[in-house]
Amino acid sequence: MVKIEEGLPSSEISAHSLHFQHHHHPLPPTTHHSALQSPHPVGLNLTNLMKMARTPHLKSSFSINSILPETVEHHDEDEEEDVEKKSPAKFPPNHNNNNLNTTNWGSPEDHEAESDPESDLDVTSMSPAPVANPNESDPDEVDEEFVEEDIECDGETTDGDAENKSNDGKPVKDKKGNEKPPYSYNALIMMAIRQSSEKRLTLNGIYEYIMTNHPYYRDNKQGWQNSIRHNLSLNKCFVKVPRHYDDPGKGNYWMLDPSAEDVFIGGSTGKLRRRTTAASRSRLAAFKRSLIGPMFPGLAAYPQFGQFLTYPPTAPSLLASMYQRYNPFAPKGGPGHPGLPPGLPGLPGPPGPQGPPGPPPPPFVAPPTSSELYQRLQYQQLLHQHAAAAALAAHQRQLSVAAASAASQPPPTHHHPHLAVGQAPLSPGGDSPGPSPQPLHKPVTVVSRNS
């Protein structure tokens, strides 16, 4: 930045002006008059360029070029304003734009050339990033519709699992020419356990199987054993079983989890896959039906629980017998109503010889909770009391029938109906023979004892 002081002679001003021009941008050899007039038209050219830069570009996307040049040119504009303030009216205004073609740094073509790399950078573009190799395709995406819980069963989280193929697409080979098997560590572990005689192996047994069947790992022992241990610990398909104290040897056994029955090894990827989830879901639903169906018959009122209650007839009856044995307070389902015992009214009433059964209570409309279980317990106690009262009434009726049959053995008289009830009138005169006293006092004695 050149500072021009007032009071300097015109020759010094021209020298400073020439120094200003040659310091910033070299010019071709011109006359002294053009050198004196060049600084001010340059400022006008900068103003025109700033206006051109501020004009919005007719593009569909936002460009960084509309931001960065404006900030740079604001700084140049401030410098020119300072120069113009300190040198007022020293140079006559020249509206000739011939210097636009002579200056290299004031041409709009050079300015556009400098901003071309920036204008190509689109900030707001929603286009995806370029793919490194479009020919590469993830094999997991092909089998995605057939795979479920793949991360859970085949999580390659180890650093020792290298690529099975080199950069040129050929299989990886060691110094002896042994190819690396196209299987993941989880697949190797599953093959080792499934092909064992007892369906279980120790860690050393898994190592031995891998090195025996795949010589590549026998000759290259760099980190793959640590990866095997890592996958055994993290994968849910493998379960650690402690060794029995009578079993000699060291280390725990590793077995396959029962949920890994549908897991197989993919032929194209060499990783673990689940065959179909429909079979596993059907087995899980059948298991839930076998558990929930017999225990909660009141859920039949809910249509959303129908799938759990319509269990097949091949469900084990042992579960129902154990439920009846260990849960005596749960009501037994009858043919008429599933939640009440057969042949009993809904609410306990006074015992009667031939009382009609009361109306059945409304069906269960709520899933069993703790309060409902408590109500069932109270209801069961009431049922026991009602059953005891009904048994006592039946016993009394049986005794009365026995007394009536015993009283009907003598010749029939007019007093026999009264005797059957138990009222034996005493003959005041004693002239009537009267029945035998033993049948008369037998029902009275039995009734008084039970009462």
Curated annotation (Swiss-Prot):
Where the record puts its DNA-binding region(s)? 180-274
Q: Name one GO biological process term.
A: segment polarity determination
SMART domains attached to this UniProt entry: FH
Choose one Gene Ontology CC annotation of this protein and give it: nucleus
Give the compositionally biased regions (Acidic residues).
111-121, 137-161
Gene Ontology molecular-function annotations: DNA-binding transcription factor activity; sequence-specific double-stranded DNA binding
Pro residues bias (residue ranges): 338-366
Residue numbers spanned by region Disordered: 22-42, 73-181, 330-369, 402-451
Biased segments, Basic and acidic residues type: 162-179
Q: Where expressed (tissues)?
A: Expressed in the posterior half of each parasegment just anterior to the parasegmental boundary.
Keyword check for Endoplasmic reticulum: no
Q: Where in the cell is it found?
A: Nucleus
Cited InterPro entries: Fork_head_dom (IPR001766), FOXG1 (IPR047208), TF_fork_head_CS_1 (IPR018122), TF_fork_head_CS_2 (IPR030456), WH-like_DNA-bd_sf (IPR036388), WH_DNA-bd_sf (IPR036390)
Q: Report the main location listed first in the record.
A: nucleus
Sorted alphabetically, the keyword list is:
Developmental protein, DNA-binding, Nucleus, Segmentation polarity protein, Transcription, Transcription regulation
Q: Where is the composition biased (Low complexity)?
A: 94-104, 419-430
The free-text function statement in the UniProt record for this protein reads:
Transcription factor involved in segmentation. May function primarily as a segment polarity gene. Different levels of slp activity seem to be required in different segments.
The protein here is known as Fork head domain transcription factor slp2
Q: Which organism is it from?
A: Drosophila melanogaster
Lineage of source species: Eukaryota, Metazoa, Ecdysozoa, Arthropoda, Hexapoda
